Amino acid sequence: MEFSVKSGSPEKQRSACIVVGVFEPRRLSRAGEQLDEISEGYLSTLLRRGDIEGKIGQVLFLHNVPNVLSERVLLVGCGKERELTETQYKQIIAKTITTLNDTGALEAICFLSELHIKGRDTYWAVRQATEATQDCLYNFDKFKTNKENTRRPLRKLTFNVTSRKELARAELGLQHALAVASGAKACKDLANMPPNICTPLYLSEQAIALGQRFEKITTEIVDSEQMAELKMDSYLAVAKGSANPAYMSLMHYNGGNADQKPIVLVGKGLTFDSGGISLKPGEAMDEMKYDMGGAASVFGAMKALAKLNLPINVIGILAGAENMPAGNAYRPGDILTTMSGQTVEVLNTDAEGRLVLCDVLTYVERFEPDCVVDIATLTGACIMALGHHISGLMTPHKGLANELLSASNQSSDKAWQLPMDDEFQKQLESPFADMANIGGRPAGSITAACFLSRFTKSYTWAHLDVAGTAWRSGANKGSTGRPVSLLTQFLINRSENETTAVNS
């Protein structure tokens, strides 16, 4: 699909469809008023008649509006003008795109990016509208034999901004959105793959393919034999019961100077998590293919990064493994020696993600990173705490926390910081090893982060728990593509700071 931005009056636009807003109660937006004027009150007559109230979710599709150059006019309900929220804005865009895609209009000019959202500018409006459009049009039908084809799908969408002065910001928003949307799609496609196809080996093959596509990405694969030589025994224990061996995929993006320390993104890549010997309930176990959502988001962020050609160095790691029960699988009661030399008593084999990540977090010390961010569908406790709308952020480093929260706010890919006070560490005590792999039910997300923190002492580190945000259940089941937008914004901000430092 083709996107563009422009600045112009609605009455001068010649297109298959022009989209304008209607506010409650029955009041046209500025662009709507301009169309109403040239149509000699045609639109306002419809409003007075009650054809559309302006409530969010309402649409009115019109053909042959008098004196309007465009073939069609789509009136979209935008709610109360002064109370419009960010979430409502994205809902309005989604409703617009769904309607347009069903009408047979091949192109459209949209004036909804002119809507006022408190604290947001044109850059944000265009970026969010573009990302929401791509999300709305996403469909994963790779394995369907009877595919549903839209009669005449929307092929071109132009966002109109209020003045020419806003064009530069709008174009930047569009550029960033297209990169993020491309990364989010890559994340969704990878996460939605069935686990009989998306194995740890498959993850490594996708990482290699990404490196072949982008000149600045070099991919390195660490297989199980190499992990054994590195004494990554905690990681390997998780994969022991599976017929699919573990693979750790490292994507090195070299966009900065050779002496610039890399940012490291680590994604938990459990391509299927049965729980192991501590077997999960059968209900919804199919969704445990999404336990590689962290790795999928790192993969997507690396693609977005490469498309934006940012001047920084980043290493994206996909920590691939599969957790299955078997006669040789690891057990509750086992004591594992991690790559760091610290020992862990396994109390629950379904708390496996941290056992994979702890060895990867030790492995990345060799890169002397600027910072490390791990992304993982780590705990059900995070869903209990924050639901399905907000990712959990945990870090002992205030500066990095502020950066990630700022990126969250800028991208509207929400995260919330949870505490990591020393008192929580006591819950991980074991009478037989240096620590246990779980700390009991209370504050489960926090104690999981505390566990990981014991392997990150040599660098600045943060943990994103995306257990509640990486995928949706129910009728619209599927990967959300999160937190690709947050991660990409974090990297954009870092690159801008790097450029400023170089030029100062």
UniProtKB/Swiss-Prot annotation:
Cofactor note: Binds 2 manganese ions per subunit.
Catalytic activity annotation: Release of an N-terminal amino acid, Xaa-|-Yaa-, in which Xaa is preferably Leu, but may be other amino acids including Pro although not Arg or Lys, and Yaa may be Pro. Amino acid amides and methyl esters are also readily hydrolyzed, but rates on arylamides are exceedingly low; Release of an N-terminal amino acid, preferentially leucine, but not glutamic or aspartic acids
GO annotations of cellular component type: cytoplasm
Highest taxon in the source lineage: Bacteria
EC supergroup of this enzyme: hydrolase
Sequence similarity: Belongs to the peptidase M17 family.
Protein name as annotated: Probable cytosol aminopeptidase
Binding site for Mn(2+) 1: 273, 350, 352
Molecular function terms from GO: manganese ion binding; metalloaminopeptidase activity
PANTHER family: CYTOSOL AMINOPEPTIDASE, LEUCINE AMINOPEPTIDASE-RELATED
Gene: pepA
Cited function: Presumably involved in the processing and regular turnover of intracellular proteins. Catalyzes the removal of unsubstituted N-terminal amino acids from various peptides.
Cell compartment(s), UniProt: Cytoplasm
Coiled-coil intervals, chain numbering: none
HAMAP family, alphabetized: Cytosol_peptidase_M17 (MF_00181)
